[in-house]
Curated annotation (Swiss-Prot):
The keyword Lipid biosynthesis does not apply. This is Toxin Td1. GO terms for cellular component: extracellular region. Disulfide bonds join 31-82, 35-57, 43-63, 47-65. Keywords: Amidation, Disulfide bond, Ion channel impairing toxin, Neurotoxin, Secreted, Signal, Toxin, Voltage-gated sodium channel impairing toxin. Expressed by the venom gland. Its main location: secreted. It is found in: Secreted. It comes from Tityus discrepans. Gene3D superfamilies: Knottin, scorpion toxin-like. The modification Lysine amide is found at residue 84. Has the structural arrangement of an alpha-helix connected to antiparallel beta-sheets by disulfide bonds (CS-alpha/beta). It comes from the Eukaryota. SUPFAM superfamilies: Scorpion toxin-like.
Length: 86
């Protein structure tokens, strides 16, 4: 029983340490990467190219990716610069 508790504790500890981020892919101009007119596999392929686990076209408007590395640029409301120039 103690081994089981230790195993579960280690499992949760590893899960807390290894965190990945989710988010919308971002264009160089700071806007979300659109997917309305793209092929069906566009978003999952782009997410994989950036080392994400998976992705999809959210409401046919923008690519959303799961488990992206911390270094991958994703759109964030707090740092939004879309349409604001450089």
């Amino acid at each position: 029983m103690i081994r089981f508790i230790l195993f579960i504790s280690c499992f949760f500890l590893i899960g807390m340490v290894i965190e990945c981020k989710d988010g919308y892919l971002m264009e160089p101009n700071g806007c979300k990467r659109g997917c309305l007119t793209r092929p069906a596999r566009y978003c999952p392929n782009e997410c994989s190219r950036l080392k994400g686990k998976d992705g999809y076209c959210y409401l046919w408007l923008a690519c959303y990716c799961y488990n992206m590395p911390e270094s991958a640029p994703v759109w964030e409301r707090a740092t939004n610069r879309c349409g604001k120039g450089k």
